[in-house]
Amino acid sequence: NVTGGGLLKETSDNYYTAGTAEEFLNAIQSVKKSGKASVIELTADIALGDKEVNNFDSYSSFITAHKLEPLTHPTLLKTGVSMLKLADMSNLTIYSKNGAKITHTCVDITGSNNIIIRNIEFDEIWEWDDYTEGAYDRNDWDYMTIEKGSSDIWVDHCTFYKAYDGVIDVKTPVNDSNITISWCEFLPASEDNVFFDEMMNAMKANPDNYPYYKHLLEEGMTDQQIYNYAYGQKKTHLLGQSDDDSSAKN
């Protein structure tokens, strides 16, 4: 039953609260070790970039630096972007009562079942694409990827801002995957536009450092037109292995 994952009382030994990145990762580590139905309540915003988490390498069995490092965003160049792997896990709820935020990570749910992710905001895995001139084909940063036999996954009442690639990708799903995405918001740019504006302002101040941005200006676009062009999300969901793979299901 997709709604049954990790429903525990707050007094349970397997109910964890996390207000920092380290507390959250320690909770994941404990859940993986115990193998028991568990809840992780996120009580504050956490940032999971590989350059900003204390003792990051000590969690390397399930979170690593993303293989494609940031190239242009001033914040991400400092924080890095990570890949959080929820692999071979079951009966786990990750939620927040207050809509806490997770930034600078891509969540990969692999070979897992009965997972609930609820009332969490995901933000800040986008940067301007000079490398492929706006095609956004390099970084492969998605907020969430569900793949390799994962089933009974419920993503509910979450908020997702602009991502470099996709927002939620479900790769090679089968008819009985039971993957539900409900009552979620998919929004442009970033919360209050702060993270998004930082990137746009950096380009405006130093156009020579961003060849594709400079090219658009030289072709007659205004700063505001480029801002509007970059503001929206390229794509949201993908059901299948890739856009053109024969296994893609529309």
Task: Give a label for each model feature.
Residues L8-E10, D142, D244:
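Intrinsically disordered, low-complexity, compositionally biased regions/tails
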Residues Q29-K36, G49-T93, K101-N119, E124-S150, ...:
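Extracellular beta-strand-rich solenoid/capping regions of secreted or surface-exposed proteins
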Residues N1-E41:
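Acidic Gly/Asp/Thr-rich repetitive segments characteristic of extracellular carbohydrate-active
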Residues A21-E23, N98-I102:
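Short beta->alpha connector loops
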Residues S90-N91, Y95-N98, N113-W126, S150-Y164, ...:
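Right-handed parallel beta-helix
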Residues D13, N139-W141, D165:
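Short, solvent-exposed beta-strand edge segments and adjacent coil->beta transition regions
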